[in-house]
């Protein structure tokens, strides 16, 4: 069992990583006997894990209610969020309740925002079931729902009480979802840790076949890197923005193509190549390093071009609504080398459009 602490003073919390955690009541700290829980999951995961997690919590003396949401990015909305509030109020649940997010990024983000908002804030626990949520979205306290005009535009910074990563969940993950998670894994290597990127080049095949030791190391390393950034810049005023490599472009793809048609990791993968091409055009990143990124993403089964039906011009309105925009000016996350990146303002729209065009499918 691995345990990593996200250090945020009185709001610090543990990330527990191991196989078989769903069999251990102690995994779900800080829950105690007699407490009340609303377990939030979706219709795909409920048949796989709901009874198991409910059972282990009830074994610990916890009183468990549940709400099952529809599955898909298109349901990460205010309307679906309201179903969680309704379930909480109907029971009813008070300020001493705990929400448990059992699912991937959609369930985690939506449940976290529900916890931040319900009765002005209740405790919640992240139980991520996808690779993407285990290495990224469950850690750091970003919670949100989407708006038709932009991804994650309505939300809050709100830290969980703990994160429970059961590696066994990856055994039920569809290959496309595994690849989507690998995009966020590769991102960490590009922005923060060149040695980890090298390791990924050598060990990607092991990750694709869900080799236990390789996957455990991969998730642990990501869960070490992200908390370091979050602890230094919890509310994304500077350093934390680096974690958004590829996201300004990627969120544009997701919004333009319709939420759920491109998985988040797929859009981020194409966006990271666009960021690399932008950096190339600025003369601060080599084409050889861009090719290393493209090769690794391709091996992972990820797209490296934008949608053929989306013109370069179609990206700009979405990018100008990005949360990193300051005083009407785009701020882009750009690689400087494998393992090093920067937040860059003042890049001309023409250069960005040309970089996007470099990445359009033939």
UniProtKB/Swiss-Prot annotation:
It catalyses: 7-phospho-2-dehydro-3-deoxy-D-arabino-heptonate = 3-dehydroquinate + phosphate. Zn(2+) binds at residues 184, 247, 264. GO terms for molecular function: 3-dehydroquinate synthase activity; metal ion binding; nucleotide binding. It is found in: Cytoplasm. Disulfide bonds: none annotated. Its EC number is 4.2.3.4. NAD(+) binds at residues 71-76, 105-109, 129-130, 142, 151, 169-172. It comes from the Bacteria. Catalyzes the conversion of 3-deoxy-D-arabino-heptulosonate 7-phosphate (DAHP) to dehydroquinate (DHQ). Belongs to the sugar phosphate cyclases superfamily. Dehydroquinate synthase family. This is 3-dehydroquinate synthase. It comes from Escherichia coli O6:K15:H31 (strain 536 / UPEC). The gene is aroB.
């Amino acid at each position: 069992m691995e345990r990593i602490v996200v250090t945020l003073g009185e709001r610090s919390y543990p990330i527990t990583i191991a196989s078989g955690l769903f069999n251990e009541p102690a995994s779900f700290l800080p829950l105690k006997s007699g407490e009340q829980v609303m377990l939030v999951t979706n219709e795909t995961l409920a048949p796989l894990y709901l009874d198991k997690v409910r059972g282990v919590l009830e074994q610990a003396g916890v009183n468990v209610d549940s709400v099952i949401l529809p599955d898909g990015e298109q349901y990460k909305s205010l309307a679906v969020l309201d179903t969680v509030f309704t379930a909480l109020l109907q029971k009813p649940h008070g300020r001493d309740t705990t929400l448990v997010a059992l699912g991937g990024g959609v369930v985690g983000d939506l449940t976290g925002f529900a916890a931040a908002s319900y009765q002005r804030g209740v405790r919640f626990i992240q139980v991520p079931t996808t690779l993407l949520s285990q290495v990224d979205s469950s850690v750091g306290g970003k919670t949100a729902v989407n708006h038709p005009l932009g991804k994650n535009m309505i939300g809050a910074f709100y830290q969980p009480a703990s994160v429970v990563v059961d590696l066994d969940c990856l055994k039920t993950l569809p290959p496309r979802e595994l690849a989507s998670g690998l995009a966020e894994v590769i991102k960490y290597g590009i922005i923060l840790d060149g040695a980890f990127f090298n390791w990924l080049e050598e060990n990607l095949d092991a990750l694709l076949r869900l080799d236990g030791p390789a996957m455990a190391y991969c998730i642990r390393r990501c869960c070490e890197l992200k908390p370091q950034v979050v602890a230094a810049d919890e509310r994304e005023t500077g350093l934390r923005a680096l974690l958004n490599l590829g996201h300004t472009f990627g969120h544009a793809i997701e919004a333009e193509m319709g939420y759920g048609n491109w998985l988040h990791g797929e859009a981020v993968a194409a966006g990271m190549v666009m960021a690399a091409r932008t950096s190339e055009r600025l003369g601060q990143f080599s084409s050889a390093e861009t090719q290393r990124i493209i090769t690794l993403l391709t091996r992972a089964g990820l797209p490296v071009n934008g949608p053929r039906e989306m013109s370069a011009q179609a990206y700009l309105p979405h990018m100008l609504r990005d949360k990193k925009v300051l005083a009407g000016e785009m701020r882009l996350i750009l690689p400087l080398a494998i393992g090093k990146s920067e937040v860059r303002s003042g890049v001309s729209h023409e250069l960005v459009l040309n970089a996007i065009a470099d990445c359009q499918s033939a």
